[in-house]
Each structure stands twice: as structure tokens, then as C-alpha cells.
């Protein structure tokens, strides 16, 4: 099985090293094409206004000055000697759940794999802070992901669907199981902090937070909060089919 790895935290991210160890428990044919720099929050964006610069680190490790989407395209269309059987994107430092999947470069890497006709999985590890220090239990994803991915590859899933895995913030032995979940919902709390530079011109920092909101029992959020691994199947068809039919009926047009 040929596996292509990418992420959005960059080629030097600890989570990418974790992902490679996970992948090597599944196959010896593992390739890495990851961003040269941190691309967090760039979602499913492409680099169109400047050239892509590819740097070969060794036989199967490459860094690209581009987004996670660029990396998957580069891997599938140029770097690999043949099509991969699986694209793995991650392991992200921090969960990618609920509405955050729309911002996530990690999820976007799996999206692009899916668009290119390759089975794809995004992996993210929840964390906590101890003072100003981020504590990420990478060992949890590393311990549980290989078997879970192996089982998923045996079971298979439909074309046009990617899988979004989130691992809870706990030790490997404290994980309470796996739940197949729905994408949850979080409330937005985005604020702009306006400041002035040395010449008096304004600039802004975006403070992106979340407010309180009800959490559905079957959601990815609920699974992670309960200490379970969350597995959410996401499809690329964004059509709201029920609303499409309702609008057609309301307007008296074909839908």
C-alpha cells in the first residue's frame, strides 16, 4: 500500500513525525510532501499567483512552498512514482471539529486526496495548556491510529467521502472507544484587535475564539469531551438537498 502524507503545520512539525510512524506501521511505501512553513487555517486554498518551489530532503521526503492542497497535488501528480492508495493528513496539533473543519488545512489535505480519487483521512490530536505550555499527548494518536486506519481500509468507504479523525486529550490507555460521529456546531466569537504601528497606521490581529453552544450527543465535540476517538465521515457534496427541494416547491420551479 502506497501512502502519501501531508499536514498544515509544516515539514518540521512534531505531528508529521508522529504521522509517519503511524503510516510505517501500515506500509513501507510511505512518501511525505508537506508545506515548507506553517499553513494553519488556510483551508482548501491553492497557490495560484506565485510558483510552487519543491525542495527534496531525501528520497521520499519533500517540502513545498505551498498549501496542504498544493502538497497533495504535487505528491500525486509529480513526486510519487504512481498513484497512492491512501492520503493521510496530520497529525494536527489541536482538534479539527465542528465548523473548524471549514478552516482546517489538515482536513483540506484529505479533501484534495478525495477529489483526486484517493481514499483520504485527516488526523488531529486534542491538547491542553499547562500555563503557557501546550501539552499534546501525541502518543494517543500514535497508539490508536494504526489499527483504526487498517480496519477502515479493510471496510472501505464511498468515493467522494473523507474521514476526519480526532483523538481525545488523554493517555492512550484512557481512551474510552471510538464513535462514528456527526459534525458538530460551535458558536463564533471572532474579534478584531486594532493597533497602530510606529507611523500611526492601523493594523489588526484576529482573535478567533468560540462561545458557548449546545452540544449534540452524536457530535464530534461530544465524543472528544467524553474521552472517545471521533470519526466523522465528510462528503464533498455541499448541496443542502432538503432545502433544494423546499426552495423548488416554494418558487414553483424544477429542483
Curated annotation (Swiss-Prot):
It is found in: Cytoplasm. HAMAP family: SurE (MF_00060). PANTHER family: 5'-NUCLEOTIDASE SURE, 5'_3'-NUCLEOTIDASE SURE. It is an enzyme of class 3 (hydrolase). GO terms for molecular function: 3'-nucleotidase activity; 5'-nucleotidase activity; exopolyphosphatase activity; metal ion binding; nucleotide binding. Its EC number is 3.1.3.5. Binds 1 divalent metal cation per subunit. Nucleotidase that shows phosphatase activity on nucleoside 5'-monophosphates. It catalyses: a ribonucleoside 5'-phosphate + H2O = a ribonucleoside + phosphate. A divalent metal cation binds at residues 8-9, 40, 92. This is 5'-nucleotidase SurE. GO terms for cellular component: cytoplasm. It holds the Pfam family SurE. Keywords: Cytoplasm, Hydrolase, Metal-binding, Nucleotide-binding. InterPro entries: SurE, SurE-like_Pase/nucleotidase, SurE-like_sf. Belongs to the SurE nucleotidase family. It comes from the Bacteria. Its cofactor is a divalent metal cation.
